[in-house]
């Protein structure tokens, strides 16, 4: 036995909920959502099989019911006007349905949403196109918390609950909290297809403005020659497990973090874009505008794949991700595939423009069959590590980084290899004992500039008479038994002959000395040697103590295996068969501690000893010594020396 109810179009007062449906038919309906509303014909008929308690809803011409056969999915209904297939609604959540609210147009369902909002609805079910049709909307402003649910999902098929932007509309859906007394929180899109009416349509599909806790989950956003999503003043939000495809143009793309509203803090903040699939699109797939100031952006575990060029192709070269501004961002564990200049004019993966600031992390990302740059850093600070590039079908080239930003960087070269596992590039070798200026700290923000011979793309340009950088020695060097050799890699900016000068200060109190940086000779190493008594608390401060600017690339720090010592020695004439001995060179002067001096080198001098025999005589176990000159001839010899140089080898 079954029951039939016929209702005039647009009249839904008798059965807009599960409860009223049960009252109408005097039967229990627990596991299905009852949905009924006037559609595009004069009536809608709703049937409930009393044996299964499953309601079926259909859109058909009036007629007397003759018979039907039903199952949990569909009902084959025979009437005097024909045979029709009706579908069951299997939604188990008791939430309002879009079709509970009637429309004033056969081609635009926007009114239904507006009525739902006015009714205070916070969750709204969107029926699948197989039962209703594509839900058509245009310039729909949602001004309060509203969650739109469907039974579609993230896939390239076009079935299930589908919201389609009307071609002539300037945008599709706008979650718009502008001017609200209470900022909307929550809401979003779940298990839905959101599409343009055709691939050539313009106008963004989704806009979010002045909203918090927005969620887009398990959706498919497709088919528009404009932005898929534009976000402004959107906070604590996420987009996950969603497909983006056939989106964008030369001037648009998939996701735009647009200009902030009012103040820089009214921006896109704490936004998670993760586990999404992106393909077949144009423009910048993720972009921030030059006045967006986004902060705490998480782009993680996404697949970016060029697998075809959509209707609106790129005209100018593009980066997949392009930041006009960015404060803090983490781009991790993503895959990029087949982005080349031949594939829709893609020149690289990440571009950070001059408006970027603070830190972007680019960690553990893979690029397959791409070309161009892995990162172009024109502004801000990039921390990059663990990134791999597989050349794949690209004939040649290795993806690395281009850096012109004046801020310090922390970039590890990309490891590049071919599909057979052959490594083709690991970037420039950096000595493990070398510490780049990028990784040193200080009180002055001396700007960086590009230099083809800099160790990490850019080097610090330091004006005269200012502190350059600082470095704190590790505790292993503060044991009172360590001798350190510190070398600074520097270059004099002046090319007209004025030398530069570099000073090393320890702990802000002790100057080790100043050394000359010779002008017009390129990069050079300035060496300082620290005895245990000079190391102190280990705070190294490098200062440009000269009158011209210098370039500072970084420092080498090594535990010394020797110490170079020199002292005044002017022996004068030495008689035949006689010898002369220098002043005692005490270990307290040379190194300052006991037990470190093991042996001595042969001395050398600043002049000629003219046949004299030279020897080093150890004075005690601690390493004090003399230098002796002996005349083995039958005539006096006068050496032309004033200074002696000797290397003391350490344990």
From Swiss-Prot:
<comment type="function">
    <text>Functions as a receptor binding protein (RBP) and probably mediates the attachment to the host capsular exopolysaccharides. Displays a depolymerase activity that specifically degrades the K21-type polysaccharides of Klebsiella pneumoniae capsule.</text>
</comment>
<keyword id="KW-1161">Viral attachment to host cell</keyword>
<keyword id="KW-1160">Virus entry into host cell</keyword>
<keyword id="KW-1227">Viral tail protein</keyword>
<dbReference type="GO" id="GO:0098994">
    <property type="term" value="P:symbiont entry into host cell via disruption of host cell envelope"/>
</dbReference>
<feature type="region of interest" description="Lectin-like">
    <location>
        <begin position="561"/>
        <end position="651"/>
    </location>
</feature>
<feature type="active site">
    <location>
        <position position="305"/>
    </location>
</feature>
<dbReference type="GO" id="GO:0098996">
    <property type="term" value="P:symbiont entry into host cell via disruption of host cell glycocalyx"/>
</dbReference>
<keyword id="KW-0945">Host-virus interaction</keyword>
<keyword id="KW-1238">Degradation of host capsule during virus entry</keyword>
<feature type="active site">
    <location>
        <position position="295"/>
    </location>
</feature>
<protein>
    <recommendedName>
        <fullName>Depolymerase, capsule K21-specific</fullName>
    </recommendedName>
</protein>
<feature type="region of interest" description="Catalytic">
    <location>
        <begin position="100"/>
        <end position="428"/>
    </location>
</feature>
<feature type="region of interest" description="Carbohydrate binding">
    <location>
        <begin position="447"/>
        <end position="560"/>
    </location>
</feature>
<dbReference type="GO" id="GO:0098671">
    <property type="term" value="P:adhesion receptor-mediated virion attachment to host cell"/>
</dbReference>
<keyword id="KW-0946">Virion</keyword>
<dbReference type="GO" id="GO:0098015">
    <property type="term" value="C:virus tail"/>
</dbReference>
<feature type="active site">
    <location>
        <position position="307"/>
    </location>
</feature>
<keyword id="KW-1235">Degradation of host cell envelope components during virus entry</keyword>
<keyword id="KW-1233">Viral attachment to host adhesion receptor</keyword>
<dbReference type="InterPro" id="IPR011050">
    <property type="entry name" value="Pectin_lyase_fold/virulence"/>
</dbReference>
<feature type="active site">
    <location>
        <position position="236"/>
    </location>
</feature>
<comment type="similarity">
    <text>In the C-terminal section; belongs to the K21-specific depolymerase family.</text>
</comment>
């Amino acid at each position: 036995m079954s029951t039939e109810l016929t209702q005039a179009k647009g009249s839904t007062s008798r059965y807009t909920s599960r409860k009223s449906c049960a009252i109408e038919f005097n039967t229990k309906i627990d596991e299905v959502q009852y949905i009924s509303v006037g559609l595009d014909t004069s009536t809608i008929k709703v049937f409930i099989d009393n044996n299964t308690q499953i309601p079926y809803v259909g859109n058909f011409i009036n007629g007397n019911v003759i018979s039907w056969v039903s199952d949990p999915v569909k009902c084959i209904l025979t009437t005097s006007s024909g045979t029709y297939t009706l579908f069951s609604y299997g939604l188990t959540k008791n939430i309002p349905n879009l079709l509970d609210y009637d429309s004033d147009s056969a081609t635009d369902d926007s009114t239904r949403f507006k009525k739902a909002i006015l009714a205070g609805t916070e969750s709204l079910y969107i029926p699948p196109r197989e039962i209703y049709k594509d839900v058509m909307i245009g310039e729909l402003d949602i001004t309060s918390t509203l969650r739109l649910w469907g039974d579609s999902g993230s896939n390239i098929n076009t079935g299930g609950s589908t919201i389609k932007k009307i071609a002539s509309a300037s945008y599709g859906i706008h979650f718009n909290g502008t001017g609200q007394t209470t900022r909307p929180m929550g809401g979003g899109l779940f298990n839905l297809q959101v599409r343009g009416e055709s691939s050539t349509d313009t106008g963004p599909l989704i806009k979010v403005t002045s909203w918090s806790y927005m969620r887009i989950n398990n959706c498919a956003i497709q088919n528009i020659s404009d932005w898929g999503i534009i976000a402004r003043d959107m906070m604590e939000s996420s987009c996950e497990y969603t497909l983006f495809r056939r989106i964008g143009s030369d001037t648009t793309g998939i996701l735009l973090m647009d200009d902030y509203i009012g103040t820089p803090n009214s921006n896109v903040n704490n936004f998670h874009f993760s586990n999404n699939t992106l393909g077949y699109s144009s423009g910048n797939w993720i972009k921030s505008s030059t006045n967006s100031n986004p902060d705490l952006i998480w782009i993680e575990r996404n697949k970016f794949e060029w697998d075809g060029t959509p209707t609106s192709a790129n005209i100018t070269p593009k980066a997949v991700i392009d930041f006009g501004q960015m404060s803090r961002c983490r781009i991790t564990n993503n895959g990029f595939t087949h982005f080349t200049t031949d594939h829709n004019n893609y020149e690289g993966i990440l571009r950070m423009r001059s408006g970027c600031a603070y830190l972007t992390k680019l960690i553990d990302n893979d690029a397959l069959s791409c070309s161009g740059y892995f990162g172009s850093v024109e502004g801000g600070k990039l921390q990059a590590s663990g990134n791999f590039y597989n050349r794949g079908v690209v004939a040649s080239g290795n993806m690395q980084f281009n850096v012109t930003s004046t801020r310090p960087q922390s970039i590890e070269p990309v490891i590049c290899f071919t599909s057979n596992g052959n490594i083709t590039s690991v970037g420039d070798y950096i000595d493990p004992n070398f510490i780049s200026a990028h990784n040193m700290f200080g009180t002055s923000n001396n700007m960086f500039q590009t230099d083809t011979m800099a160790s990490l793309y850019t080097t610090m340009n330091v004006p005269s008479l200012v502190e350059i950088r600082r470095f704190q020695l590790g505790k292993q060097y503060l044991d009172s038994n360590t001798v350190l050799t510190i070398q600074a890699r520097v270059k004099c900016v002046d090319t007209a002959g004025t030398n530069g000068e570099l000073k090393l200060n320890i702990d802000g109190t002790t100057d080790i000395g100043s050394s000359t940086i010779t002008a017009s000779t390129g990069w050079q190493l300035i060496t300082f040697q620290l005895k245990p008594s000079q190391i102190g608390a280990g705070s190294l401060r490098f200062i440009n103590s000269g009158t011209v600017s210098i370039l500072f690339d970084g420092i080498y720090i090594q535990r010394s295996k020797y110490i170079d010592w020199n002292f005044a020695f002017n022996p004068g004439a030495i008689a035949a068969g006689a010898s002369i001995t220098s002043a005692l060179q005490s270990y307290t002067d040379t190194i300052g501690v006991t037990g470190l001096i093991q042996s001595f080198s042969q001395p050398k001098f600043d002049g000629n000893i003219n046949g004299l025999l030279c020897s080093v005589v150890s004075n005690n176990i601690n390493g004090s010594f003399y230098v002796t000159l002996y005349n083995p001839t039958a005539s006096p010899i006068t050496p032309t020396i004033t200074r002696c140089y000797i290397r003391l080898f350490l344990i």
